[in-house]
Amino acid sequence: MNANPCEVCRFQNKQCVNNCMFALLFPSSDLEKFDVVNRIFGLETLTFYLKDLSPMERIDTTRTLYYEAKPCFLNPPKNPSKFLEALLNYPYQKAEEVSKTKKLLASYSRPCVVLALPAPKYTQSKSKPSVLRKRKRKTKSSDESAIRVVEDS
């Protein structure tokens, strides 16, 4: 039996035994730590999280739970209307963010300079000159003996 019971045993009005799981985690000198974690998570949840862990993992887990619970404890949400108000203002906040980003990008961009380059000159291939050839093709018409000259390109 310990002379100074841990905060968990003191909260439960129990006598703290030598192998108490919470003795190292919540000593009697640190009341605030247990109070914050207990109010946010509760004792049953805390016990559930810590029961299967090694002593070193328990210390890390307790520290993490405390750091997660402290902001909620210090700044509790007053009512659900604050949350709804934040959700309703979300699109407007994003629109403002986009406009600010566009202005910032515009301040970084340089004016675009277009150089007038001469038009490319197209040359003909020297191996096969393109010459229009005329050939005769027969077409069907009222006069079957008519021959028509067609230009191929």
From Swiss-Prot:
Q: Where is the composition biased (Basic and acidic residues)?
A: 140-153
Q: Where is this region: Disordered?
A: 126-153
**What is the species listed in this Swiss-Prot or TrEMBL entry?**
Arabidopsis thaliana (Mouse-ear cress)
Q: Which gene encodes it?
A: LBD26
Q: Under which name does UniProt file this protein?
A: LOB domain-containing protein 26
Q: Boundaries of each LOB domain copy?
A: 4-105
Phylogenetic lineage: Eukaryota, Viridiplantae, Streptophyta, Embryophyta, Tracheophyta
Q: Which family does it belong to?
A: Belongs to the LOB domain-containing protein family.
